[in-house]
Curated annotation (Swiss-Prot):
The keyword Repressor does not apply. It comes from the Bacteria. Belongs to the MnmA/TRMU family. InterPro entries: MnmA-like (IPR004506), MnmA-like_C (IPR046885), MnmA-like_central (IPR046884), MnmA-like_central_sf (IPR023382), Rossmann-like_a/b/a_fold (IPR014729). It comes from Bacillus cytotoxicus (strain DSM 22905 / CIP 110041 / 391-98 / NVH 391-98). This is tRNA-specific 2-thiouridylase MnmA. The active site is at C104, C200. Residues 150-152, 308-309 are annotated as: Interaction with tRNA. It is found in: Cytoplasm. Disulfide bonds join C104-C200.
Length: 371
């Protein structure tokens, strides 16, 4: 039997930003028994000795007091280090480009946090993500948020039935300008706070400086695939496929791009032209596969896919190799498919799940991304 809202406890993850603030406000207005939780995942004292998490938590406290809900701070630093940051470093060490947001959602927000919330007697958890959950045809489905520009299902691709059955996304039917307006109308302390961007544990810091604190940089040669040396690179971990800026190659003609990495020889491959064929792949092997539905998949099916956040949907054919591996055949060649990143699958508005890009091929030949 369904509980009434006032009998339903919803524990919401609050970051100190406007999105989670408005999500908490909406739940409170809908009559739920709401508790705000601030997740401290990282000891993020910046160069000036200021802990930005303290500022964010103060904003959470102010908003929770404004809307009249209790709040707590919970420390997940150990879990975050073990499950997210260690993965982040391991991927860079392997010459890949990881997506820590996907792993944070999988291991922290919808695992450690969800378990903590259930221990507090929660019926549901909620977050400020732009996504929707619907119960249709006897199972939970994850749908894109109605704000195309802000939809975050790409980062939620590792969720499954268990998590979705206990999750609310109060912002899924709203667009960002509406959320700002609601925050202003309610006089919330975070109404005009700017959105955070980039990787949460790096913040405003220089990426190279941050990474070099944890991984020793190994400078090497930057060259074309034919062997023409174009300069030196600072360390393969600092570059991603399709990157243009920061290469330091002068001269006339088309701009230069990163087209590959040779980890064994510590070579960064570069070539000219945005539409250089070396940047285009038409077949992908991906692992760490997760399907939102528990129902058996066809051995081969058509859908659309995103190979990076905010990319247009691309038509693909997915072939199931085994429980943890899939082959993806692209209808058209796609630029700068990057090992380590997530590939996420859709059927219209429904997010079907996702996987991690491992190998990229063009016309049956493996691209020299991680030779």
């Amino acid at each position: 039997m369904n509980k009434l809202p006032h009998e339903t406890r919803v524990v919401i993850g609050m970051s100190g930003g406007v999105d989670s603030s408005v999500a908490a406000l909406l739940l409170k207005e809908q009559g739920y028994d709401v508790i705000g939780i601030f997740m401290k995942n990282w000891d993020d004292t910046d160069e000036n000795g200021v802990c930005t998490a303290t500022e964010d938590y103060n904003d959470v406290i102010e908003v929770c007091n404004q809307i009249g809900i209790p709040y707590y701070a919970v420390n997940f630093e150990k879990q975050y280090w073990d499950k997210v940051f260690t993965y982040f470093l391991d991927e860079y060490r392997a010459g890949r480009t990881p997506n820590p947001d996907v792993m944070c959602n999988k291991e922290i927000k919808f695992k450690a946090f969800l378990e903590h919330a259930m221990a507090l007697g929660a019926d549901y958890v909620a977050t400020g993500h732009y996504a929707r959950v619907a119960y249709m045809d006897g199972e939970y489905k994850m749908l894109r948020g109605v704000d195309d520009n802000k939809d975050q299902t790409y980062f939620l691709n590792q969720l499954g039935q268990e998590q979705l059955s206990k999750t609310m996304f109060p912002l899924g039917e709203l667009k960002k300008p509406q959320i700002r307006e609601m925050a202003k109308e309610a006089g919330l302390a975070t109404a005009t706070k700017k959105d955070s961007t980039g990787i949460c544990f790096i913040g405003e810091r220089n990426f190279k400086d941050f990474l070099s604190n944890y991984l020793p940089a190994q400078p090497g040669v930057m060259q074309t695939l034919s062997g023409e040396v174009k300069g030196k690179h600072d360390g393969l971990m600092y570059y991603t496929i399709g990157q243009r800026h920061g290469l330091g190659i002068g001269g006339n003609g088309d701009p230069w791009f990163v087209v590959g990495k040779n980890l064994k020889e510590n070579i960064l491959y570069v070539d000219q032209g945005f539409h250089n064929e070396l940047l285009y792949g038409d077949e992908v092997i991906a692992t760490n596969v997760n399907w939102v539905s528990d129902r058996a998949k066809e051995k081969e099916f058509k859908c659309t896919a995103k190979f990076r956040y905010r990319q247009e949907d691309n038509g693909v054919t997915v072939q199931i190799v085994d429980e943890n591996t899939i082959r993806i055949l692209c209808d058209e060649p796609i630029r700068a498919i990057t090992p380590g990143q997530a590939v996420v699958f859709y059927d219209g508005d429904e997010c079907l799940g996702g996987a991690t890009i491992d190998e990229v091929y063009r016309s049956g030949e493996q691209l020299d991304y991680l030779g």
